[in-house]
Regions:
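Short, basic/aromatic-enriched C-terminal tail that caps enzymatic domains
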Residues: 232-260
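Active-site catalytic loop in hydrolytic enzyme cores
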Residues: 86-158, 172-179, 244-249, 259
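CN hydrolase (nitrilase-like) catalytic-core segments centered on the catalytic cysteine
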Residues: 63-78, 147-230
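Short beta-strand scaffold segments in enzyme catalytic cores
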Residues: 81-83, 94-97, 129, 211-213, ...
Length: 260
């Protein structure tokens, strides 16, 4: 089994300007100085967290999906983040998971943020996504999903190794973001990555970043704090396997069945 090099981008976003965001993010990704396996972008990285889906949504054949395919091929890495997608007359806050060969899978955000009225605009997802990538099993989720531990619960029969969240999580609730991200790593005996944005959106919401990568013990491997930038770290396969072999909490949990 191999190690996994993970890169994530913490950045401000241009409000409702997908072309500007793709261009700015593309420039930042071009600064990668080492090979990486996985590149993670924030939630709604083309628009900011918006309820104006009719004017901002793209289709799966639109420019953002094409751009993700270009970036994945250029960096020989999976590139992921969420965007506003229209499909069959419905709108989704859709995490797009794009491999270097152009193949694509996706996860639609399950828990919609009722405080912002997200449920009135978007359709919730019905299933989790767990992807096998270069020897690691990865479960990508979106923002508000972080507050619901049953949805991220690891399965001892086929555990994921890395749990990741892409987010537009406001600074006013940053304590919850940091606390829950750490809890998700510890309770699932898995590495955890949370990728948030910084700056202020057009609605006046401030974002403090606090993107972080943690190991399965809940120890910080990378903390971005409020800094803009592209962060890279290599997760060690043997460290995760050794810890799980010694600390078998996944096998001691209660049996359950998850239904969407």
């Amino acid at each position: 089994m191999s190690d996994l090099t993970v890169s994530f981008l913490q950045t401000a976003l241009h409000w409702h300007d997908a072309a500007a965001n793709r261009a700015a993010i593309g420039q930042q990704l071009a600064s990668l100085k080492q090979p990486t396996d996985l590149i993670v972008l924030p939630e709604m990285f083309t628009t900011g967290f918006s309820m104006e889906a009719p004017g901002q949504a793209e289709t799966m054949s639109g420019p953002t999906v094409a751009w993700l395919r270009e970036q994945a091929a250029a960096h020989n890495a999976v590139v992921t983040g969420s965007a506003i997608i229209e499909e069959n007359g419905s709108y989704f806050n859709r995490l797009l998971w794009v491999r270097p060969d152009g193949s694509l899978r996706y996860y639609d955000k399950r828990h919609l943020f009722t405080l912002a009225g997200e449920q009135h605009t978007y359709t919730p997802g019905q299933a989790r996504l767990v992807e096998d990538w270069r020897g690691w099993r990865i479960c990508p989720l979106v923002c508000y999903d972080l507050r619901f531990p049953v949805w991220s619960r690891n399965q001892p029969a086929a555990p994921y190794d890395l749990l990741l969240y892409v987010a537009n999580w406001p600074a006013v609730r940053r304590t919850a973001w940091m606390t829950l991200l750490r809890a998700r790593a510890i309770e699932n005996v898995a590495c955890a990555l949370g990728v948030n944005r910084i700056g202020q959106d057009a609605l006046g919401h401030d974002y403090s970043g606090d993107s972080a990568l943690l190991d399965a013990k809940g120890s910080y491997l990378v903390e971005a704090h409020a800094e803009a930038g592209l962060f890279t770290h290599t997760l060690k396969r043997d460290e995760l396997d050794d810890f799980r072999a010694r600390f078998t909490a996944l096998n001691d949990g209660d049996a359950f069945e998850l239904r969407a």
